[in-house]
């Protein structure tokens, strides 16, 4: 069911250390492939970059990794876990009780993080494949042509997204060891190149970071931060993957990962100092520091690391969407569980969307340099939203002093605000693609959240106690044939004995549904990820059963599985009579047949509704046409199901005036009378 159930959540193990390599650090671990390259290009290339720019950029990278990744996420954010689960939606569930407006940063951050999921696989795989240009044979055959790079990248992405439906448990077992080799490889090569110029170590002094931002030698100005930020884009994913590996394993493994990453950047900086001023064309410092004998190996290893980073992000996107669905921030989508572990999700619609978006980005931008110009903008938004939610969490924590909360908020809003401002220019250089995608996701979230509020506003309720006698007479009325032994209604609104009025209309008015037992089931999603509990109220009868299911936001909402257990428990306790079942392949079966009734609300005659509310509900109806059916979502595809359409809003017809048209013949006849 997931590593989060391990009792050693706060402890570190050797296996957990390796697992963390493959799951948590894929994104941040591939940043050395393109971060320094982006900085060099922003400074005018190898020919024009200055020593101050190299040392200053390295200092900015070191302190960005320290302040944002280490301090904010590893030291602080990892403590804000929701029953061992991390990420922006888990953080939201911890603080949403304090203020309704917190839904806004949660939706904005979630939408931005999902949109980034399309760009990350494209930029990481492209950056790795571009390393082929460092191989003489490849360079002689294709030169600086980008088409072969694009074709290879598209092929790798196609394979990556196509295998998702089969699960990744087998290949996932090698992710950790491969990433451990990857980190060790570029850490060691960085250390070797560091011996070429130890002067880069002065970058540890934050003076050089500040000096670069103010220096006239900095040709990119404040916008250099847009490239520097690429070094820490994986920090948000680190927090999101908390539930997969545990806090202890992240705390122990991060120092190793950070040292390797910084050594890689130091090695690249040392090489740049030795070769600045030379005309070497478009070079990637990551591959340039390597001897020719290691180029092929490094490209293969970098490609594997890029695939692993992309896989981790794709899996993270599946988890993020499933959480948003259960928090009623996104429509229901079909979710499959292809692996042996419950935590392995596969959402076909999300997989297809990410694949198409990533492929479009590769074709549209062509090179990793162009992608890097658009990369990072969405993550700065997510980090700002996380800072807001995390501040509220810390403010409500009794052990945290208020002065620390103020300092935390002020410091990280300022730092991340600078990164956002520096990255905003990326909007004009392709960032608009990610912004448009994030805006579309946010639009759907806003519509879904608001429509849910309107649904409860217009839904009418009735008291079941007022209709118990009628329902009892109906179940005993011999003039009606038995509809089904058990009739089950799934309802979104049930407060004790008060239920959706449309359900009673379906039972008594449409076509009286005679049954031995009437079930009313409501699913309540809890803030805990793996809750599975229920409450039963039979209203003093043995034929009405009101069931409140309490399921964690990571649990499958498969109603028949839970209902079988509840029926058995009620019969064993004597609260529910045994049901005679003469024909069955199960000897001695004492539970009758079930019919599930799903009521589908349609917006009808909503002219009296405000225009905005009408737009929201009509938009939701259009979105629902391409989402998973309630029957599939609730695991009813192998059960007997009836779907009935009922009006959500119906104007009072008694206020409508209509007059009978009388013909001349009838008028004469009426006068004669």
Swiss-Prot record:
Domain of life, per UniProt, equals Bacteria
The cross-references to Pfam families, in alphabetical order and at most eight, read: K_trans (PF02705), K_trans_C (PF22776)
- Give the source species: Lactococcus lactis subsp. cremoris (strain SK11)
Q: Name one GO molecular function term.
A: symporter activity
Which gene specifies this protein's sequence? kup1
Localisation: Cell membrane
Task: Tell me the protein family, please.
Answer: Belongs to the HAK/KUP transporter (TC 2.A.72) family.
Which lineage do the record's taxonomy fields give for this organism? Bacteria, Bacillati, Bacillota, Bacilli, Lactobacillales
Q: What does this protein do?
A: Transport of potassium into the cell. Likely operates as a K(+):H(+) symporter.
What's the name of the protein?
A: Probable potassium transport system protein Kup 1
Question: Topologically, how does it sit relative to the membrane?
Answer: Multi-pass membrane protein
Q: Which reaction does it catalyse?
A: K(+)(in) + H(+)(in) = K(+)(out) + H(+)(out)
Is-annotated flag, keyword Cell membrane?
A: yes
Span-the-membrane segments of this chain are 14-34, 58-78, 101-121, 147-167, 175-195, 196-216, 220-240, 252-272, 294-314, 345-365, 374-394, 403-423, 427-447
């Amino acid at each position: 069911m997931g590593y989060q159930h391990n009792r050693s959540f706060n402890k570190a193990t050797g296996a957990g250390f390796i697992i963390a390599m493959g799951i948590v650090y894929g994104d941040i671990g591939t940043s050395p492939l393109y971060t320094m390259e982006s900085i060099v290009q922003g400074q005018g290339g190898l020919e024009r970059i200055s020593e101050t720019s190299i040392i200053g950029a390295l200092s900015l990278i070191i302190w960005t990794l320290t302040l944002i990744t280490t301090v904010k996420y590893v030291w602080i954010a990892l403590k804000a876990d929701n029953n061992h689960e991390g990420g922006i939606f888990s953080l939201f569930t911890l603080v949403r009780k304090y203020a309704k407006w917190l839904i806004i940063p949660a939706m904005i951050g979630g939408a931005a993080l999902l949109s980034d999921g399309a760009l990350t696989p494209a930029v990481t795989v492209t950056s790795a494949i571009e390393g082929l240009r460092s191989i003489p044979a490849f360079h002689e055959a294709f030169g600086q042509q980008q088409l072969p790079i694009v074709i290879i990248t598209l092929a790798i992405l196609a394979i990556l997204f196509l295998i998702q439906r089969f699960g990744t448990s087998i290949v996932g077992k090698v992710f950790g060891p491969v990433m451990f080799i990857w980190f060790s490889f570029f850490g060691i090569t960085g250390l070797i190149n560091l011996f070429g110029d130890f002067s880069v170590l002065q970058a540890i002094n934050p003076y050089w970071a500040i000096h670069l931002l103010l220096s006239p030698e900095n040709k990119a100005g404040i916008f250099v931060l847009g490239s520097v930020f690429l070094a820490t884009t994986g920090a948000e994913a680190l927090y999101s993957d908390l539930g997969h590996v545990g806090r202890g394993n992240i705390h122990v493994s991060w120092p190793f990962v950070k040292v390797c990453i910084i050594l890689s950047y130091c090695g690249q900086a040392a090489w740049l100092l030795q070769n600045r001023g030379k005309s070497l064309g478009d070079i990637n410092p990551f591959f340039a520091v390597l001897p020719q004998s290691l180029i092929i190996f490094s490209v293969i290893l970098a490609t594997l690391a890029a695939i692993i980073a992309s896989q981790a992000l794709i899996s993270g996107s599946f988890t993020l969407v499933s959480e948003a669905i259960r928090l009623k921030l996104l429509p229901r989508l079909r979710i499959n569980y292809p692996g042996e572990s419950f935590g392995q999700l596969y959402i076909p619609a999300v997989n297809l969307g990410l694949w198409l978006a990533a492929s479009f980005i590769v074709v549209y931008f062509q090179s990793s340099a162009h992608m890097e110009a658009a990369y990072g903008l969405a993550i700065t938004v997510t980090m700002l939203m996380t800072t807001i939610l995390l501040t509220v969490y810390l403010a409500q924590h009794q052990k945290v002093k208020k002065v620390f909360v103020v300092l935390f908020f002020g410091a990280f809003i300022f730092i991340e605000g600078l990164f956002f401002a520096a990255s905003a220019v990326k909007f004009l250089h392709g960032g608009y693609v990610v912004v448009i995608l994030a805006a579309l996701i946010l639009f759907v979230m806003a519509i879904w959240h608001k429509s849910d509020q309107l649904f409860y506003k217009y839904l009418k309720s009735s008291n079941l106690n007022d209709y118990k006698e009628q329902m009892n007479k109906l179940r005993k009325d011999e003039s009606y044939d038995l509809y089904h032994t058990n009739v089950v209604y799934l309802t979104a609104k049930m407060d004790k004995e008060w239920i959706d009025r449309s359900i009673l209309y379906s039972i008594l008015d449409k076509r009286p549904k005679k049954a031995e037992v009437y079930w009313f089931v409501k699913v309540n999603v809890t803030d805990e990820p793996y809750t599975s509990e229920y409450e039963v109220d039979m209203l003093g009868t043995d034929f009405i059963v009101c069931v409140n299911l309490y399921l964690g936001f990571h649990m499958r909402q498969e109603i028949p599985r839970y209902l079988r257990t509840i029926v058995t428990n009620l019969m064993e306790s004597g609260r529910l009579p045994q049901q005679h079942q003469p024909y069955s392949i199960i000897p001695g079966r004492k539970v009758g047949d079930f019919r599930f009734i799903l009521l589908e609300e349609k917006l009808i005659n909503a002219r009296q509704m405000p225009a905005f509310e009408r737009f929201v509900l009509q938009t939701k109806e259009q979105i629902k046409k391409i989402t998973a059916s309630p029957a599939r979502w609730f695991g009813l595809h192998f059960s007997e199901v009836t779907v009935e359409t009922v009006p959500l809003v119906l104007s009072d017809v008694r206020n409508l005036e209509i007059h009978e048209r009388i013909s001349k013949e009838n008028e004469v006849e009426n006068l004669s009378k």
